[in-house]
Amino acid sequence: MAMTIHVDIVSAEKSLYSGTAEMVIAPGQRGELGIYPRHTPLLTTLRPGSVRIKAPNQDEEELVYVSGGILEVQPHLITILSDSAVRGADLDEAKALEAKRAAEEAMKDKAATLDYAQAQAELAQAVAQLAAIKKLRKLP
């Protein structure tokens, strides 16, 4: 039997995933982090993107989109806290495309600095959601 690690993914609204995994890949600020059981303790921030979970005895990885957040790793436990998170199967491509279009439109008005920064953050989240949808559907 393969070694496993317990994984909890929690958003402000609810718990999205709680179970064991053989491996987790998370979107760190400086690149993707691959985490296996007995990993060295770690605390870092996450950027918007998809968390991939390889559960024992399953061929397919489970995908959870996170809008950013905090990742804590202990040798036998991974905890991800995110403002918002969505299971990959529940992502809405049309909604993500509309959010991307709206953010790009808002970024055209560079006069409002605060709105521009907000639009940049929204654009990053929309692009990350679309990338998660693409991974889920295994599109090139």
Curated annotation (Swiss-Prot):
Alphabetical keyword list: ATP synthesis, Cell inner membrane, Cell membrane, CF(1), Hydrogen ion transport, Ion transport, Membrane, Transport
Main location class: membrane
Protein location: Cell inner membrane
Membrane topology summary: Peripheral membrane protein
GO molecular function: ATP binding; proton-transporting ATP synthase activity, rotational mechanism
Record-level GO cellular component terms: plasma membrane; proton-transporting ATP synthase complex
InterPro entries for the chain: ATP_F1_dsu/esu_C_sf (IPR036794), ATP_synth_F1_dsu/esu (IPR001469), ATP_synth_F1_dsu/esu_N (IPR020546), ATP_synth_F1_esu_C (IPR020547), ATPsynth_dsu/esu_N (IPR036771)
Family annotation (SUPFAM superfamilies): Epsilon subunit of F1F0-ATP synthase C-terminal domain (SSF46604), Epsilon subunit of F1F0-ATP synthase N-terminal domain (SSF51344)
Protein family per UniProt: Belongs to the ATPase epsilon chain family.
Quaternary data: F-type ATPases have 2 components, CF(1) - the catalytic core - and CF(0) - the membrane proton channel. CF(1) has five subunits: alpha(3), beta(3), gamma(1), delta(1), epsilon(1). CF(0) has three main subunits: a, b and c.
Role description: Produces ATP from ADP in the presence of a proton gradient across the membrane.
The protein's name in its UniProt record: ATP synthase epsilon chain 2
Organism: Thiobacillus denitrificans (strain ATCC 25259 / T1)
Gene that produces this protein: atpC2
